[in-house]
């Protein structure tokens, strides 16, 4: 019971930090733009939904490893990630270029 409550709390805090990035920071949404930001070494943190296709996920993780960027696996599907970003569409992956006022990069170092 306590563990489920704690994960819900951290899930909400991630959503709040993500909303702050959407307001005050710079980000890219989508697979192609995430790969572009990784190739140009602009991305600081990558967030991937849990239902991202395995080939796509492994390719993003490979580019992130080359660029030495943290990858966070979001604990929700692409609809949940899109809602957390404040969008009305599905978001499979996103790259945070500039966190703005949010401390999301310090709190989510990535699952590497």
Curated annotation (Swiss-Prot):
InterPro entries: Ribosomal_eL30, Ribosomal_eL30-like, Ribosomal_eL30-like_sf, Ribosomal_eL30_CS, Ribosomal_eL8/eL30/eS12/Gad45. Coiled coil: none annotated. One of its GO terms (cellular component) is cytosolic large ribosomal subunit. PROSITE patterns: RIBOSOMAL_L30E_1, RIBOSOMAL_L30E_2. GO terms for molecular function: RNA binding; structural constituent of ribosome. Gene3D superfamilies: 3.30.1330.30. The keyword Ribonucleoprotein applies. The keyword Ribosomal protein applies. Pfam families: Ribosomal_L7Ae. Keywords: Ribonucleoprotein, Ribosomal protein. PANTHER family: RIBOSOMAL PROTEIN L30 (PTHR11449). Belongs to the eukaryotic ribosomal protein eL30 family. HAMAP family: Ribosomal_eL30. This is Large ribosomal subunit protein eL30. The gene is RPL30.
């Amino acid at each position: 019971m306590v563990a489920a409550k704690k994960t819900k709390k951290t899930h909400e805090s991630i959503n709040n930090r993500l909303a702050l990035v959407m307001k005050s920071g710079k980000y890219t949404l989508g697979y192609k733009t995430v790969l572009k930001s990784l190739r140009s070494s602009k991305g600081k943190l990558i967030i991937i939904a849990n239902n991202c296709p395995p080939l796509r996920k492994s390719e993003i993780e490979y580019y992130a490893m080359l660029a030495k960027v943290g990858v966070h696996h979001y604990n929700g599907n692409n609809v949940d990630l899109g809602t957390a970003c404040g969008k009305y569409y599905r978001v499979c992956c996103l790259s945070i270029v500039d966190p703005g006022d949010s401390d999301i990069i310090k709190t989510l170092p990535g699952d590497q």
